From Swiss-Prot:
The lineage of its organism: Archaea, Methanobacteriati, Methanobacteriota, Methanomada group, Methanobacteria. This is Preprotein translocase subunit SecG. It is a single-pass membrane protein. Component of the protein translocase complex. Heterotrimer consisting of alpha (SecY), beta (SecG) and gamma (SecE) subunits. Can form oligomers of the heterotrimer. Its main location: membrane. It is found in: Cell membrane. The chain crosses the membrane at residues 31-50. GO terms for cellular component: plasma membrane.
């Protein structure tokens, strides 16, 4: 059998997008801020529901 030459890509990323390097627009929120805002929204909805 003949030995096949295996061609490998260089270990540079091979065209993959690195999302953590992409600059995004919009507010930067921590997980704690998201949880607090969700709780506030839920309480606000309950107040509106039962207030009349």
């Amino acid at each position: 059998m003949a030995k096949k030459d295996k061609k490998t890509l260089p270990p540079s990323g091979a065209g993959l997008v690195r999302y953590f390097e992409e600059e995004t627009k919009g507010p930067k929120l921590t997980p704690e801020q998201v949880v607090v805002m969700s709780i506030i929204l839920a309480v606000f909805c309950l107040v509106l529901r039962f207030s009349g």
